[in-house]
Amino acid sequence: MQIFKGDFSATKGIPPSGLCVGVHRAGAIHQKMVAKHGDHLAVWSLRPDLDFIAFKKEGLGEQGIRSTSEMESINASSEKLIYGVRGAPPEIREKAREKGLTLLADATCPFVTQQEEAELQLLESGCHLVVLSSRTHHGIPRLQGIAREKGKEVFIVEREEDVEGIRLTRFEPIGVIVQTTFWLETYKKIMARILERFANVQIRNTACIDSLQRLPEVEKLAKQVDAIIIFGWTEGMTNRMLEVARAFNAHVHKIEKVDDLQLDWLRGKGKVGIIGANETPDWMINEAIERIKSMAA
């Protein structure tokens, strides 16, 4: 059996791996803060469970850095604050100020910041929002709350047929935002339908460079193997990768940990591909490859 690993780097100077540009950058910030300030560091994160995976392998947890989604648990007198890669909503930042926490660094992905700024600009200009995104994306409730305060609606569009559910007249102002992990091919089809239905449309393509390059790599890999394994969690990028892979390969599987691998997936397959989602460290992908080798032996 041949095993093919999806490897690429969306940015020069960053070695190929499973991690996206934003997560790689956040990890470097964490390391720098530990080296500079020592222990008693708290990362406020929307997904502390994913941070824990990286911290465990890098030994950061043993060096006094922890991740939490509970601002109340951070001790202002003994811990210093870092915002995680997914950012922190305004109400969390306000709580941190009220507690008197010392903010050492903001590791929010620049593409997430770019998207949030575009959302606010469109709302301030009087637009309702159409967001090309999965409905379960963690940022949707926050955005809906902001829009309600401004008397605007938010419509989530995952596929072409969802455009019919946008309950607005042809000439009402619409601002289109693209979730950072959205697939470009789906974006093109949806936008064609939106522009056909509506006449007053502003578009902010906030898809990140990592998505634009990772998803074509999934397509390339899916076309050349008998089965493909996506190593990631049930979030935007993983779902997009599964969507792309299934368009080109009938044998697509998802794992969240190495123990999820199943021998039945490998039987009769001469070529197997594996690629990590944007928060899957390279060491985890390599462990999965070694497990596949041992299972196929």
Q: Where do the protein language model's features map onto the residues?
A:
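The feature marks the mature, well-folded catalytic cores of soluble enzymes
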Residues: 1-297
